[in-house]
Regions:
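Active-site catalytic loop in hydrolytic enzyme cores
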Residues: 117-170, 180-189, 227, 239, ...
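Cys-nucleophile CN-hydrolase/nitrilase-fold catalytic domain and related Cys-dependent amidase chemistry
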Residues: 50-132, 181-200
Length: 248
């Protein structure tokens, strides 16, 4: 087992559907030779407070760490809940400190969903918790921004283009969603085509049901049914393998 913590490359791209991770050349070779463990949290928390959501997230994080995951991705707006008509006030960093502490303690990178404010307007966004950094990083979904924690960088771009400028060394694209029925079918079709077209693995974390992982050929590796669980993926020299881990 070889961890990818601390060795993300400079170019990572979040487009409209999610977040793209680009390990550097040496890391890419290492990944193909050894294990890279990732997980999507199929999180369906319907709590009324951010503190309750955080406690629920910590349960998922501990389980992912138990399975030696390097990266855990939560669905859209996981820290506040996706069902509200209007986006709530973004939680302050002090309130989210337990998640950053967990990232440090377990040495795991976390992506969770929450509202962000830009120019007086609230919009859907992401929070990034990294083991090597003492600050929570926030940015809006689908807008231009960049993030460089130490030797890692995450760049957020506008995803309106039909031809996103993907780094040829990119090995994983993640998508944080909260969709059902028709929109879910649309999403999985879009993500599968994306994986095939750009030859990149895709991890989808969806709230409540239907999280999935596709390989670089667009072939489905694993897809979850309903319920709270971890959908995990491990990449080794033979490619991707997936598993479903129910939460106890």
């Amino acid at each position: 087992y070889t961890s990818l913590r601390g060795i993300w490359q400079d170019k990572k791209t979040l487009i409209k559907l999610g977040v793209l991770f680009n390990p550097c050349d040496s890391v890419y070779k290492e990944v193909t030779m050894s294990h890279w463990n990732i997980a999507a949290a199929q999180y369906g928390g319907q709590h009324h407070s951010v503190d309750d959501h955080i406690a629920h997230h910590l349960h998922f994080i501990a389980e992912a760490a138990h399975h030696q995951c390097d990266l855990l991705v939560f669905p859209e707006l996981s820290l506040t809940g996706p069902g509200a008509t209007a986006l709530p006030l973004p939680p302050e960093d002090d309130r989210l400190q337990p998640l950053l502490d967990a990232a440090h303690f377990y040495r795991i990178t976390l992506i969770a969903g929450l509202p962000v404010e830009r120019n007086g307007q609230r919009q859907k966004g992401l929070a990034l918790f990294i083991p090597s950094r003492d600050r929570i990083l926030r940015y809006p979904q689908g807008s231009g921004a960049s993030l460089v924690p130490g030797d890692k960088q995450l760049t957020i771009i506008d995803g309106q283009s039909d031809s996103p400028n993907l780094d040829p060394q990119a090995t994983l694209f993640t998508s944080c969603q909260s969709v059902r029925d028709y929109r879910w079918r649309q999403s999985i079709n879009t993500l599968q085509r994306f994986a095939h077209r750009y030859a990149i693995a895709v991890l989808m974390a969806n709230a409540g049901a239907g999280s999935a992982l596709w390989d670089e050929k667009g072939q489905l590796i694993v897809r979850a049914d309903k319920g709270e669980l971890l959908l995990t993926g491990t990449r080794n020299g033979q490619g991707w393998q997936g598993d479903i881990i129910p939460l106890g």
